[in-house]
Amino acid sequence: MGLAGKAAAETGADAVALPEIPKNLRYMKAVNIASARFGLDFTMETDGSDASYPVNFDPVQPREYKRISVQAKLPGAFNAYNIMAAITAVSSVTGKSFEELAALVPQVTPIKGRMTVIDKGQPFELIVDYAHTPSSFETIFPPVRKRCSGRMFCVFGSGGERDLTKRPLQGEIAARFCDTVVLADEDPRGEDPVELLKMIAVGAEKAGLKMNENLFIIHERQKAIREVFKMAQKGDIVLLLGKSHENSIIYKDYTMPYDEISEAVNALAEMGYKD
């Protein structure tokens, strides 16, 4: 989702109706999904070799299924479905087989700020992602929680002067999956930063977190990141959500240059974790 998509999600803009889904699409299913710190392995089960599909097919007749192994440098089980969609789209345009395209997936380089793993030798796992809506939280948290052997921490906020109704939902969803939630500035714009974050905290408290025990409001994002890093230990996973690839934090009277990945790397360096 780009900036336009993020703005639409934040403002609650009306959705645009998608065209009707064709009835002769390929059957595809991801099985044996194994998501690890730096990547993803799964098997793509499909009823054909490419995206082409007979116009006149008999749904009663049994179909033969292929099983294709896929490996990617993209953590997060949900990326299995993104990869299958991409393979199908490219196959439909180029005519290449699913097997040919699956073999190319390991060469795909992750986009900056999309499930970006930062490893400077610190004992905990650190992930930076763009997730900033309730639906994206529901997507990103479950697979990470499933493979987390320790505690999960997350740092996030919400866009100011945007959809207010999503804020408590963000807090509630994060609290269901994370052991500790730290609320920090995203883009408060003209709103009071702390009051904005308190609206998110309402949902987190509803889900069982307690303020200043496992729920914290630290509106200065740089400070919030450093406080979370101090808490995290071996086996824990820290998620920095919402800013991702963006290069600033917007306040009422000024815009502050900001790079989430650089900030995280600097914070780790201050703790002695460097290349």
Residue positions per predicted region:
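Short beta-strand or tight-loop elements
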Residues: 26-29, 38, 221
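Active-site regions of enzymes building and remodeling cell-envelope glycoconjugates
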Residues: 10-19, 23-29
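ATP-dependent carboxylate-amine ligase
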Residues: 3, 7-12, 53-55, 65, ...
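C-terminal accessory "lid"/substrate-recognition subdomains
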Residues: 16-18, 31-33, 41, 78-79
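Acidic-glycine-rich active-site phosphate/pyrophosphate-binding loop
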Residues: 32-66
